[in-house]
UniProtKB/Swiss-Prot annotation:
Its EC number is 1.3.1.14. Substrate binds at residues 48, 72-76, 130, 195-196. The active site is at residue 133. This is Dihydroorotate dehydrogenase B (NAD(+)), catalytic subunit.
Length: 306
């Protein structure tokens, strides 16, 4: 039986027409992709990170290809939250698609400022806190590697945000479940995982790091097994929804992430290889459900442990 709502997903604060969205940092603000297809077809868009002030990013080279993936050390280059609200978000108002705003900062005050400002934008339905940023006031340690720091950050942002808050977890921790539980305790509305793994690539001739920053975030198919494992663990430990990401490049990957416990997924690096990847997967999802003999995509959620 044909059911037009087979892909619809309800998350705290908003509804998705399908569970597919581009991940932050791999889609910019959608401008280039809007020339290829109607952005309203997407479940949502997670826009590029917003910071309090304009950031010019790290020195080049900032990207390096690796086996089954890529490294990036972009450095959160963006025009600043005020510009994003007044220009990029305004431009996205013409599309019927929920916007999730990725929020970053050098310290807790920065996060609070950006979250308060950008949550007021009318087409922003939720925030995604990028807690993989280095805490400048705490020796550069990532917010997302200390449960207490992540708890406090989440709690403070929740107080000022008028929209649901999702926290993007770093995989570069020894206890991802402990981190997820701390963030749930701070009243986060949801989680997104995983962010990139820290990696390095060397120039074969000089033997020196290719990236000017030396290390970068590893993404792409190489990290999918890590993402699946972490989502499998976290989804059984918390009662808030997960947006899954990390190495998705085809429709079967989407099924795997939802089977592991994700409620929706975000596609990152694959957009660089095939800019149509999100809509192609959306087009293939219903056939995949037929193949698996299930009526609604939600029926697959968490089947790996049910």
């Amino acid at each position: 039986m044909k059911n037009n709502n087979r892909l619809k997903i309800n998350l705290p604060g908003f509804e998705l027409k399908n569970p597919i969205m581009p991940a932050s940092g791999c889609f910019g603000f959608g401008k280039e992709f809007s020339e290829l297809y109607d952005l309203s077809r997407l479940g949502a868009i997670i826009i590029k990170a917003a910071t309090k002030n304009e950031k010019f990013g790290n020195p080049t080279p900032r990207v390096a290809e690796t086996s089954s993936g890529m490294l990036n050390a972009i450095g959160l280059q963006n025009p600043g939250v005020d510009h994003i609200i007044n220009h990029e978000l305004k431009e996205l108002e013409k599309y019927d698609v929920p916007i999730i705003a990725n929020v970053a900062g050098d310290d807790i005050d920065d996060y609070v400022y950006v979250a308060k400002r950008i949550s007021q934008a009318k087409n922003v339905v939720a925030l995604e806190l990028n807690i993989s940023c280095p805490n400048v006031k705490n020796g550069g340690i990532q917010f997302g590697t200390d449960c207490n720091v992540a708890y406090n950050l989440t709690k403070k942002v929740k107080k000022v945000s008028s929209k649901p808050v999702y926290v993007k977890l770093s995989p570069n921790v020894s206890d991802i479940v402990g981190m997820a539980k701390a963030i749930e305790e701070a009243k986060a509305d949801g989680l997104s995982l995983i962010n990139t793994l820290i990696g390095m690539a060397l120039d074969p001739k000089s033997g020196k790091p290719i990236l000017a920053n030396k290390t970068g975030g590893l993404s792409g198919p190489a990290i999918k097994p890590v993402a699946i494992r972490m989502i499998y663990q976290v989804s059984q430990a918390v009662n808030i929804p997960i947006i899954g990401m990390g190495g998705i490049s085809n429709v079967q990957d989407v099924i795997d992430f939802i089977s592991a416990g994700a409620s929706a997924v975000a596609i990152g690096t694959a957009n660089f290889i095939n800019p149509y990847i999100c809509v192609e997967i959306i087009d293939q999802l219903e056939s995949k459900l037929d193949e698996l003999n299930v009526n609604h995509i939600w029926d697959l959620k968490g089947r790996s442990y049910r």
